[in-house]
Amino acid sequence: MGEMSKSDRLMAAIRGEAVDRPPVALWRHFPGDDQRPEDLARATVAFQRCYDFDFVKVSPASSFCLRDWGSQDRWTGSMEGTRDYTVHPVQSSDDWRELRLLDPADGALGAQLQCLHLIADELAGEAPFIQTIFNPLSQAKNLVGAERLPVHLRYYPDALRAGLETITETTCRFIAAAREAGIAGVFFAVQHAQYEIFSEEEYSLFGRPYDLRVLEAAQGLWLNVLHLHGTDVMFDLLADYPVQVVNWHDRETWPTLADAKEHFRGAVCGGLQRWDVMVLGTPERVREQAADAIVQTGGERFILGTGCVTPIVAPTSNIHAARAAVEHG
């Protein structure tokens, strides 16, 4: 088989067709750079040019979609490259009803659209790129604080629903604008479909309906990735979401890659443990774990990656090893 383009390779993997090699993609945060669209675009493209992955995940700070509602955050040295929230604008249940619809062309959302256009211009079709979208419940968590979200959900459900409506509509508007920038899909990050946080009934009421409305806004795009964050995830509850790829912490929680293929119709993305292997391991260990993932999946309907963001302290030799692990011979 001749060498396939990145897009053709991914499309074939999603459909379960033969590929010249398994696709591979890692992504990371760029703390500091993620505060300015030009710098985030430059860092994202440089990372891609260094490692030549099959798709590019654009990773802004999670606050990009919240700053215009008053959220504030700062980087305190997290090895994941993520930022800590210092101001939560929702202080009482009444504040959910005060959230206003945002214009995606303005403020922090507009800056992220600028970043996407810069990336599109620089990549010029050499690799598909996808925009991170945090699901409405994840955005709500960062607006009110992680500890208070379950309280509001259980004691002020109508107020929270009002906020989720505004968040959902704003997110759909942003995706519509991001499509114009040339994204191939969205990386849809779901953080609360975990049994240690909510019950299936709670997620079915406060997560799933809003998730599906956001994903409806992304329909027609060909590389939508569902990311299930954390452990003890509600995989089966979300396995029917209209996405082409699912990514989760497969080395840390059920299901395995092989099991997931029995529950999800598209491609599974994972195989590499991000801390013990990508950060603390050696290139040899990376190659061993990648080989195991390929055996688990038969190299079909499979994209090699980490279960979540690659820490910013991962040795470059390990990242190069992950990229090389899918090459034949």
Functional labels for PLM-detected ranges:
Residues 37-62, 66:
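Segments that shape or occlude catalytic/ligand-binding pockets
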Residues 1-31, 43, 85, 103-329:
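Active-site loop segments of alpha/beta catalytic cores
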Residues 64-105, 118-121, 125-129:
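A contiguous, low-structure linker/loop signature
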Residues 32-35, 57, 64-77, 139-140:
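Short active-site-adjacent helix-start/loop capping segments
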